[in-house]
């Protein structure tokens, strides 16, 4: 049964407990770096997401990347504000077949369409917020997968900043200009707040209803989703960790 649950905990921690150390177990998710081995083409390409497209002449790039960056810019209309394509090949081992697989983009300027193996997965508008492309049921387990991203930096009145460059007093560079990661989890998982798009929710939401000089009380709401076709029995274990990795409070 596909559903979600929100688990709430109150953690009370005392400032004097900061010296306590404790090992932290695995979170049950894998995060893979997707910043390398991209191919880039500045300009539009007809059916640029096709798996059989010849991209041998494209430029090899690593992310973060800007579609055009010259030695200096002086004056409007000197930054590229057109279309660009990015492509990346990858294979996944069969051990991930029963997992949830998403690609997390921290930022693409300005609008983009994301494809896997020639099929559109999602689109995103605006370069200042991250987003997630869910690949779970689209992976080719027998060969190469092609992740393709069509990026548009053309002025769009509906997407900030919403004006052509000669109408603004700052530059906004185009492309996949922030990190990209693949996140692999079980089908029962703590959600991604950007994917869920819930006000003050999704993932883990922390508030501090009581804070004094000597102690503080933290409220944790954990958003868990079940993508299996069965009810699941589970527990959520939360820890509050300081900058040195010491666990100062925990709850289950």
Model-predicted segments: where are they?
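Bacterial Sec-dependent N-terminal signal peptides
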Residues: 1-28
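A short, compositionally biased domain-edge/stem linker segment
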Residues: 18-27, 89, 133, 203-209
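Accessory carbohydrate-binding/adhesion or oligomerization-edge regions at the termini
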Residues: 20-77, 150, 154-159, 175-185
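Short, solvent-exposed beta-strand/turn "edge" segments of beta-rich domains on protein surfaces
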Residues: 28-29, 76-81, 207-215
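Accessory beta-strand-rich segments of carbohydrate-active enzymes
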Residues: 32, 44, 81-197, 227, ...
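Residue-level detector of high-confidence beta-strand sites
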Residues: 43, 63, 123, 250-251
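Beta-strand-rich binding/interaction modules
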Residues: 116, 213-252
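Surface beta-strand/loop "capping" patches
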Residues: 187-227
